[in-house]
Structure formats: structure tokens, C-alpha cells
């Protein structure tokens, strides 16, 4: 992916109609885990933080006058398994206006493949990975090199100075 191939859209200025939209969220709460597992589950903390942000975004969307119905499903994700295929089939997600999630790229691709014929946009919320491509699959996080190029171009264009703070753990 080249920087010039990346499109950015300000969705707050792109309100197209007043018709009600159905948004589906696939979030790995993994609610079937035992309470002792949940207490030490870092992945659950990520899911809950993400969910908190989603609730704020929904509130902002409604403030902007967007009519949305939101359905939230526990995708029961781990690196080895998920419930996304079952959720898509049982809940007839081919009629959704958009699906956000799941978290792991392999399951995002699975959902995108299942909904590709219906042209339902599937949005990968957290993954930077790129694997299989589908016309209905959208990555929300650009690749590192695109982000770096855009930041450097901005800094060059504004004669900005660069101060680097580097953690030896993540070099």
C-alpha cells in the first residue's frame, strides 16, 4: 500500500440520508470464561476499552443526527477459534449496513468472505495485518510505513523539529 493509494474520509461530514442504518459489532468479550479467567485476561481489557470507545462513538453519531441501530455480539475470539461464522449465519448479517470486527485478522477475513456477495462493508478495527483482500473489507489502521510517511510529510511541510523519545524495549 502506497501513501497516495490511501483515502481518508471525514465521516462526520458525509451524512447521506436519514434512513435508519444497522451497525453490527463483533467484540470478543468471551463471556463464557470463568470469573477467575476473566480477572487476568488482558485481551478482555482491550475488548472492554474498545467497547467503551464504541459507546462514545455511538453517542456522538446520534448527536450528529445519524439514525443507527447497533447490534453487539460476543465473537468468542481467541487465536485458535471464534464464533463469528455462526453469528453471521444465525443472525442474518447479510442485511446489515456495516459490520465492525472481529478483532483478529483471520476472523475479519472470514466475515468479509461470508458477506462479500451481499456487499456488506466489514471493518477491521484493530489489526494492521493484511492478508486476503475482499472488496468489502476495510482496514481502519493504515500500515506503519503509510503513517510514518504522512507524519514526516506534515512535519517537513510545517518546518517542524523532530525530537525522538525511544524506549529500548520497542526498538
Residue ranges and their predicted role:
Residues 100-171:
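Extracytoplasmic ligand/sensor domains, especially the bilobed periplasmic-binding protein
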Residues 49, 53-56, 82-86, 106, ...:
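Extracytoplasmic/secreted proteins, especially bacterial periplasmic and envelope-associated proteins
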Residues 64-130:
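Beta-alpha junction/loop-to-helix N-cap segments that form part of ligand/metal-binding clefts
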Residues 31-37:
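Short, solvent-exposed loop/turn elements at domain surfaces
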Residues 29-31, 76, 169:
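Residue-level signal for short, function-critical loop segments
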Residues 1-27, 31:
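Pro/Ala/Gly-rich low-complexity, hydrophilic intrinsically disordered segments
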Residues 44-70:
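Signal peptide-proximal N-terminal region
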